[in-house]
Amino acid sequence: MKIAILSRDGTLYSCKRLREAAIQRGHLVEILDPLSCYMNINPAASSIYYKGRKLPHFDAVIPRIGTAITFYGTAALRQFEMLGSYPLNESVAIARARDKLRSMQLLARQGIDLPVTGIAHSPDDTSDLIDMVGGAPLVVKLVEGTQGIGVVLAETRQAAESVIDAFRGLNAHILVQEYIKEAQGCDIRCLVVGDEVVAAIERRAKEGYFRSNLHRGGAASVASITPQEREIAIKAARTMALDVAGVDILRANRGPLVMEVNASPGLEGIEKTTGIDIAGKMIRWIERHATTEYCLKTGG
């Protein structure tokens, strides 16, 4: 097969591993910067160009689209989809997952347990919002945040009000969420491919911090997950219509809670921690699903 990887930086670990895994299985691979793609949207002859040349047909596309370029990155991916390329994750699913508020609403509708979460637009509702999630300590999150950026633990009610007011002063959209104290700064990252959790790690926050993201200095170890955690991770990925997802779970006294579903999970931390060839599993998923029937169905 001919596979395109959409990424702004082909030197990143995840891109290199996906490229290596695809080549090892006999596929042709090209890494394309989505911001250098431009499109002819034409009902008679739609096409996509890259740095002055018209791109050939790709059997499959692996999107590694960062949050900062979600709008144009998903537009480029959508063009590949229109031309019959199989997307490892569909553009509509990526856009949906990037909206934290919408994601939580969809997950809640499917009965997936979450931390109690509130959102309000008016400053007049701040006090009620804090009470809604059980008071302080609580977590304030930017809706557009990623990798632990824009996440603040407010340990007192006064601190919570100050943080919420400060974010509102920046015209930022925020979520207010209960703090799961018993998680003790740890979460579980489950890597889902299709209908299987292929790997899981426990991420522990750096001493003195509460965010466990590896990009923020957290440490990782292999996690043994329960059948309930496995089931909830797969259900969360399926709810978001993602074939590949990083599902972050908090272990609360009342059971596992889904904190976030990531549409473009990094591979470095979880592969190096577990020793599992996740990139290879992703390529094998593509091989099973990037079929002639898919191309015919989508017009390729």
Swiss-Prot record:
In terms of domain of life, where is this protein from?
Answer: Bacteria
Indicate which residues the UniProt annotation says bind ATP. Answer: 141, 178-179, 187, 211-213
Q: Which InterPro entries match?
A: ATP-grasp, ATP-grasp_RimK-type, ATP_grasp_subdomain_1, RimK, Rimk_N, Rp_bS6_RimK/Lys_biosynth_LsyX
Residues involved in Mg(2+) 2 binding? 260, 262
Question: One Gene Ontology cellular component annotation?
Answer: cytoplasm
SUPFAM superfamilies annotated for this entry?
Answer: Glutathione synthetase ATP-binding domain-like
Residues annotated as binding Mn(2+) 1 are 248, 260
Q: Which residues form the ATP-grasp domain?
A: 104-287
Cofactor mode of binding and number, as noted = Binds 2 magnesium or manganese ions per subunit.
Q: Which PROSITE patterns match?
A: ATP_GRASP
* Required cofactor names: Mg(2+); Mn(2+)
Q: What is its EC number?
A: 6.3.2.-
Q: What's a BP term from Gene Ontology annotated to this protein?
A: translation
Which residues bind Mn(2+) 2 per the record?
260, 262
Binding positions for Mg(2+) 1 per the UniProt entry: 248, 260
Keywords from the named record: ATP-binding, Ligase, Magnesium, Manganese, Metal-binding, Nucleotide-binding, Protein biosynthesis
Q: A single Gene Ontology molecular function, please?
A: ribosomal S6-glutamic acid ligase activity
Please explain the role this protein plays, according to its UniProt record.
An L-glutamate ligase that catalyzes the ATP-dependent post-translational addition of glutamate residues to the C-terminus of ribosomal protein bS6 (RpsF). Is also able to catalyze the synthesis of poly-alpha-glutamate in vitro, via ATP hydrolysis from unprotected glutamate as substrate. The number of glutamate residues added to either RpsF or to poly-alpha-glutamate changes with pH.
The family classification in the record reads: Belongs to the RimK family.
Q: What is this protein called?
A: Ribosomal protein bS6--L-glutamate ligase
Name of the coding gene: rimK
